[in-house]
Swiss-Prot record:
The keyword Lyase does not apply. The gene is truA. Homodimer. This is tRNA pseudouridine synthase A. PANTHER family: PSEUDOURIDYLATE SYNTHASE, TRNA PSEUDOURIDINE SYNTHASE-LIKE 1. Formation of pseudouridine at positions 38, 39 and 40 in the anticodon stem and loop of transfer RNAs.
Amino acid sequence: MRIALVVEYDGSQYHGWQAQTGLHTIQQAVEFALSKVADSSISVVCAGRTDTGVHATNQVIHFDCEKDRSIRAWIHGANTFLPKDICVKWGKEMPENFHARYSAVSRRYRYVIYNGAIRPGLLRGNVTWQYRQLDHRLMQQGGQCLLGENDFTSFRSVECQSNTPMRNIHQLQVTRHGDLVVLDITANAFLHHMVRNIAGVLIAVGSGKHPVGWVKDVLNAKDRKLGAETAPSYGLYLVQVTYPKEFGLLQNNPGPLFLWEK
């Protein structure tokens, strides 16, 4: 039996998603909880391996288990054993050809910036703080040259292990909601640190450090050294993973909860 679950987590206190010996990770916490419910060892596969400090409102995972458990039992049972900053939101039994990572057709991230003179208290760890005034309209304008299929060498980390730098960005929007500036981006897949490097470049444009046309120059250069500083991890959220309709996976509100839909 193959089960898919949608997981939400605050990544502030974790060394990313992927299990690593001697480190506190999301995957290890999730597998521990599910193994308790199954009364046997469970290994999970996720849609997107988020980095240290990165959050998710709708991470999708799958696992195989022969134990007879209802979806309700998987959800509520796992939540009993999970720490308070991780929860399972939704679940469904899936066909054997479903794969949380390889069946996905797109991933959507939101990068949230608190743009105010004083650093935030309540939202610390959940937003990136920029005290310099950002013009979200310039950021929006600059980001449009990244749409479509491009070589994103300038926006990948030096540790990126992907075989190709080619990625297809489906949509990119930068909006302002009071003191919050939100980068909303969807692509078929993302390179290591790609969203944070895009955010860094757009922040440089929004603050007036570079002109709008510089974004295109960075893209064309295919050289990571010519881009901006990588934006911090703690403003980044994996908010949606899209699959073919045949799998019938629910599309939840992207979130995070302190944002509102426009």
